[in-house]
């Protein structure tokens, strides 16, 4: 197990560069096996999830070469093999192999997916999509077995009951080489969907409407990667550093961002009174003055991202007066970080899955646990604000989602280390 040790209370300043989007990367890597030629991904974040996905690729005899931020994937000798449940359970996003394997081989056998414990995240919409394309889906011995008919997958009209990012991506990957046209209605509109579609289109796919609620896919015979693909910047990492800069920054510039991907989040941060200057691809966050409380309500994109409700919580604690309210409409039970913040002296409560935040003028270090990625980010920010030493157990969860986090925090002046225990 990894621990993050933070000696907090020190103002941070300087520059930080945002890595490639985790939520794109964990789909693009499985999608690479759809190509008949080697794939090059640029701007790949150095996160544990990437290492885990490369391990899964090695199970299929797919060669990977990861140098700095460039990942080369060679599927020339790929073999169709079941993916082990143990590794799948440690990485929820590995469910993207369902769509990729089904699209490439007409069959996928994967262990039940795992990942962060933030409440129910059923894959029923993924299965509904696969079945609409003609596949059969079975659950056997902790495995999901998805099989295309002998005549191959056929395009279909698929209406999602909610705009699920995972289901949208999986259906795109499964249908990109299906016969005929596939239409996804009520599709997710996140930037990462557009990134996946761009990647596949550059390999010869025909995908239109990504980023809107209706996506149309015309099946093609095969896909071949021709040019490197640069992954979009991580809007969740960027939003986390915006909160950090406002909480305890003494002037921080955040590079490699796409501002429009953060519109809803930045509007809320600025509503609190944080002053931000935006350039073409960077943000400068000024030291915060007196801030006011706000209400945050998460929603599907382009609304306030559920992955940013926890990182913004320490910033709410710094407000001078009033009561802040956080309502997560996407994952209402995403409140596991609240008892941990209370250990640090935070005046914060949960009532019926609604988070109530009150001004807290002093946080103290404590021994806390990161139950999942974004809860870990929240506790990390609180630890940087707090006086004394904070020890975050299960810090591996933070490393799953944040590119070179220890190095980046140190460059801003933080006293932080990650150790194995």
Swiss-Prot record:
TM helices/strands, residue ranges: none
EC number annotated for this UniProt entry: 2.5.1.7
Protein residues bound to phosphoenolpyruvate: 22-23
Residue numbers binding UDP-N-acetyl-alpha-D-glucosamine: 92, 121-125, 307, 330
CC annotations in GO: cytoplasm
Active site: 116 (proton donor)
SUPFAM superfamilies assigned to the protein according to its UniProt record, in alphabetical order: EPT/RTPC-like
Pfam family, one: EPSP_synthase
NCBIfam families: murA (TIGR01072), PRK09369.1 (NF006873), PRK12830.1 (NF009470)
Function per UniProt: Cell wall formation. Adds enolpyruvyl to UDP-N-acetylglucosamine.
Protein name: UDP-N-acetylglucosamine 1-carboxyvinyltransferase
Gene coding for it: murA
């Amino acid at each position: 197990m990894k621990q993050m040790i933070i000696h907090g209370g020190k103002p941070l300043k300087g520059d930080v560069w945002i890595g490639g989007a985790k939520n794109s990367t964990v789909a693009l890597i499985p999608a690479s096996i759809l190509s008949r030629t080697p794939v090059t991904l640029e701007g790949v974040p150095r996160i544990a999830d990437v290492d885990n996905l490369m391990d899964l690729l090695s199970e299929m005899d797919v060669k990977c070469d990861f140098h700095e931020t460039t990942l080369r994937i060679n599927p020339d000798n790929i073999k169709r093999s079941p993916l082990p449940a143990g590794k799948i359970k440690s990485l929820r996003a590995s469910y993207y192999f369902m769509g990729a394997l089904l699209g490439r081989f007409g069959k996928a056998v994967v262990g039940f997916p795992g990942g962060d414990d933030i409440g129910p995240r059923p894959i029923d919409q993924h299965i509904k999509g696969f079945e609409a394309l003609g596949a059969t889906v079975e659950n056997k011995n902790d495995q999901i077995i998805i099989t295309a008919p002998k005549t191959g997958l056929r395009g279909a009209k698929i209406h999602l009951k909610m705009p699920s990012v995972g289901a949208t991506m999986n259906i795109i990957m499964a249908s990109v080489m299906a016969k005929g046209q596939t239409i996804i209605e009520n599709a997710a509109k996140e930037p990462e969907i557009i990134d996946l579609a761009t990647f596949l289109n550059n390999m010869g796919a025909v995908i239109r409407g990504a980023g809107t609620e209706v996506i149309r896919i015309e099946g093609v015979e095969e896909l071949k990667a021709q040019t490197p693909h640069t992954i979009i910047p991580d809007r969740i990492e960027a939003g986390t550093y915006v909160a950090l800069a406002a909480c305890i920054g003494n002037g921080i510039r955040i590079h490699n961002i796409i501002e429009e991907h953060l519109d809803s989040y930045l509007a809320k941060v600025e509503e609190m009174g944080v002053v931000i200057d935006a350039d073409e691809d960077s943000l400068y966050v000024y030291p915060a003055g007196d801030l006011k409380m706000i209400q945050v309500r998460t929603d599907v994109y382009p609304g306030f991202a559920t992955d940013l409700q926890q990182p913004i919580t320490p910033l709410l604690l710094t407000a001078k007066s009033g009561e802040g309210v956080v309502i997560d409409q996407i994952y209402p039970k995403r409140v596991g970080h609240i008892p941990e913040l209370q250990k640090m002296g935070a005046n914060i409560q949960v009532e019926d899955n609604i988070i109530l935040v009150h001004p807290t003028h002093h946080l103290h270090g404590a021994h806390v646990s990161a139950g999942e990625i974004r809860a870990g980010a929240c506790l990390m920010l609180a630890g940087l604000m707090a006086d004394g030493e904070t020890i975050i157990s299960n810090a591996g969860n933070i490393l799953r989602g944040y590119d070179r986090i220890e190095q980046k925090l140190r460059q801003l002046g933080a006293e932080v280390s990650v150790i194995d225990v």
